[in-house]
């Protein structure tokens, strides 16, 4: 297989796994594009992206443009003379960037497109209770996550796993798919497929304070899916009505019961060294949680410190 000259674009840890896989393949990484450094925390400490750290450690040419439409940046990209751009978890690219390479610009998306277009496909696959997801490579065009599909790889979702666990599986699966996709592009041995569009398609919007809050009017199964879909980050949350403090919940087991307890939904029961939260169709057995201002703790640690939460309501 001939070497493809690649410019890689990405920012988080998910992208690092893919970049590492590409470096150890037969291709040549000519440059890495990642997000500018940012100040974070109370001390405004400068944070570098995971991709930047990797590029520096591996002595790869690095660019951190603030404005992707900047003429100087565009010219520098053109001078690299790459065959293809590879994008994994990066910003939306302007046409002046993605149209540069001869073989196009491809993106890796952590879902089976056209399902779950958007910023958080791994989280929403679990939140929606899907039994299957996967990864997709596609050509970037004007609309986000709408380009022609090149390849896909499917993966079963365990009914008990959380987003953190699925993330690791998809990172590995995505790395392999990228190498496979580059191989068929290099040989020109593929036929890309136009994406379908339908009102029935699930979407994967950016996570925020509203869509991560637990609604205790929902079924126990849907709350269970929300909690594991948001674990370990950013976490599903609720509020204790008495103290008005936020309670983050990371791990639960759902127990379905026939007798409806709709009027008790969201009530905490601490009994026999267990924490239960009532739902209208059963209860959630809480294994790991975090009260506002406190550390993340096991259910036993919580019981030892907060027995007064027995029979309190969450909202």
Give the label of every model feature segment:
Residues 3-4, 24-25, 35, 84-203, ...:
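Donor/substrate-binding cores of folate-linked one-carbon enzymes
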Residues 63-72:
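Glycine-rich, highly charged phosphate/nucleotide-binding loops
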Residues 71-81:
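Short amphipathic alpha-helix with an adjacent loop that forms part of the alpha/beta core around
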């Amino acid at each position: 297989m001939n070497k493809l000259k690649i410019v890689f674009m990405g920012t988080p840890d998910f992208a690092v796994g893919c970049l590492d896989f590409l470096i150890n393949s037969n291709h040549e990484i000519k440059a890495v594009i990642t997000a500018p450094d940012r100040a974070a925390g109370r001390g405004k400490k400068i944070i570098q992206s995971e991709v930047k750290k990797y590029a520096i450690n591996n002595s790869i040419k690095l660019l951190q443009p603030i404005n992707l439409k900047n003429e100087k940046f565009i010219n520098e990209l053109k001078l690299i003379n790459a065959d293809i751009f590879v994008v994994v978890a990066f910003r939306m690219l302007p046409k002046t960037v993605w149209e540069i390479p001869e073989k196009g610009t491809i993106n890796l998306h952590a879902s089976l497109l056209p399902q779950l277009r958007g910023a958080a496909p791994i989280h929403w696959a679990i939140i929606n209770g899907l039994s299957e997801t996967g990864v997709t490579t596609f050509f970037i065009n004007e609309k986000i996550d709408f380009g022609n599909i090149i390849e896909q790889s499917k993966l079963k979702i365990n009914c008990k796993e959380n987003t953190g666990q699925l993330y690791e599986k998809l990172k590995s699966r995505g790395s392999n798919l990228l190498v496979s996709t580059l191989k068929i592009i290099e040989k020109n041995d593929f036929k890309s497929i136009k994406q379908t569009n339908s009102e029935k398609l699930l979407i994967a919007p950016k996570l925020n304070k509203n869509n991560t809050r637990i609604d205790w009017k929902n079924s126990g199964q849907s709350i269970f899916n929300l909690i594991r879909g948001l674990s370990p980050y950013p976490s599903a949350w609720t509020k204790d009505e008495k103290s008005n403090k936020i309670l983050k919940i990371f791990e639960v087991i759902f127990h379905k019961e026939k007798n409806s307890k709709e009027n008790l939904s969201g009530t905490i029961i601490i009994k026999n060294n267990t924490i239960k939260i009532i739902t209208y169709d059963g209860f959630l057995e809480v294994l790991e949680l975090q009260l506002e201002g406190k550390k993340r703790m096991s259910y036993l640690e919580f019981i030892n410190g907060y027995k007064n939460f027995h029979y309190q309501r969450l909202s």
